[in-house]
């Protein structure tokens, strides 16, 4: 279950990252998931962000680009690019976890 309120610093980080992503990719959804969405984060937690788009031709190349975008924002960001068609496959356990526990930010 998603946490009711998220730390304002995390929201600001996610929003800055969202704006950077939108400069390069046509985004369907951006979802914060993992420990920050569940409220179970600790000082070593990364900031898991699912990025759903049809623009990801080469998922590994996109991952490298998305990781590069984190450098000037926050090193804890862990981007997870997902093709829209894969995100619509709710039988995928990873996608199911994002849908059930994630918080949509775009």
State each model region's role.
Residues 1-29, 38-43, 54-106:
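Catalytic core of pol beta-like nucleotidyltransferases
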Residues 33-35:
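Glycine-rich beta-strand-to-loop/alpha-helix junction loops that act as flexible
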Residues 45-47:
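Short, conserved active-site loops that position catalytic residues or coordinate cofactors/metal ions
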Residues 50-52:
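Short hydrophobic/aromatic beta-strand micro-patches
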């Amino acid at each position: 279950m998603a946490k009711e309120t998220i730390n304002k610093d995390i929201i600001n980080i996610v929003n800055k990252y969202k704006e950077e992503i939108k400069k390069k990719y046509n985004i369907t959804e951006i979802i914060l998931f993992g420990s920050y969405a569940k409220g179970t984060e600790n000082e070593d937690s990364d900031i898991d962000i699912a990025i759903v788009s049809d623009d990801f031709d080469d998922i590994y190349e996109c991952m490298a680009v998305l990781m590069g975008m984190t450098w000037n924002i926050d090193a804890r960001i862990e981007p997870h690019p997902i093709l829209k068609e894969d995100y619509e496959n709710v039988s995928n356990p990873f996608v199911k976890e994002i849908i059930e526990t994630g918080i949509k930010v775009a």
